[in-house]
């Protein structure tokens, strides 16, 4: 369970953020592919996202130190470095994501801004509408022994959710 930035009684009504860790054995090796699914805090003042990101990075580094391959992915509720170039945050936006910080040496972010990964739910979806805010806040963190082959946002035009799926193809390297 990730740190909760809200005090009682507000924390009762807020989502409890957590990580889902999946371990996949690597044939002929003691190493594992460790996949971490995440959904970090959205509606805090920024402290919660920072604390949750710090805890996430600590867990990822511990797994990498064991010799594992590590991929974390999901809704960071934070923009990737240079991730607002294609979808800039409008002045006075109803919601503004934080910005992810630098990673330890060798680690990398993987994201795709060809289509937005998220949208504000202030109005019904209309492709190309200037009346809503689009974001790129979903993606991945890769350990130094994982190379991205491709990252692709599937533009589902927000048919069933306020997010579009993001697909990563990666290669494990020694």
Name these PLM-found stretches.
Residues 45-48, 158-164:
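Solvent-exposed loop/turn segments connecting transmembrane beta-strands
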Residues 34, 44-147:
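Metal-dependent phosphoesterases centered on the DNase I-like endonuclease/exonuclease/phosphatase
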Residues 21-28, 142-144, 161, 168-173:
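Active-site beta-strand termini and strand-to-loop segments that position acidic
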Residues 10-11, 125-131, 155-159:
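Short proline/glycine-enriched turn/loop segments at secondary-structure junctions
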Residues 38-40, 74-76, 164:
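Active-site metal-binding loops of divalent metal-dependent hydrolases
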Residues 145-156:
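Low-complexity, intrinsically disordered Gly/Pro/Thr-rich segments
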Residues 15-20, 31, 36, 133-137, ...:
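Residues that flank catalytic or metal-binding motifs in active/ligand-binding sites
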Residues 1-32, 40:
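Structured beta-strand-rich core segments of catalytic domains in phosphoester-bond hydrolases
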């Amino acid at each position: 369970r990730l740190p909760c930035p809200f005090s009682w009684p507000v924390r009762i009504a807020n989502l409890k953020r957590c990580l889902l860790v999946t371990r996949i054995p690597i044939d002929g090796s003691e190493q594992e592919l460790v996949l971490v699914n995440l959904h970090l805090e959205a509606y805090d003042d920024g402290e919660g996202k920072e604390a949750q990101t710090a805890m996430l990075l600590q867990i990822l580094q511990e797994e990498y130190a064991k010799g594992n391959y590590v991929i974390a992915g999901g809704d960071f509720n934070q923009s990737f470095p240079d991730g607002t170039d294609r979808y800039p945050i409008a002045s006075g936006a109803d919601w503004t994501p934080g910005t992810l910080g630098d990673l330890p040496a060798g680690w990398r972010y993987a994201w795709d801004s060809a289509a937005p990964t998220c949208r504000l739910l202030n109005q019904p979806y209309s492709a190309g509408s200037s009346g809503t805010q689009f974001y790129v806040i979903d993606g991945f963190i890769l350990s130094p022994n994982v190379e991205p082959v491709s990252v692709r946002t599937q533009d589902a035009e927000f048919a069933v959710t306020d997010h579009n799926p993001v697909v990563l193809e990666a290669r494990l390297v020694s």
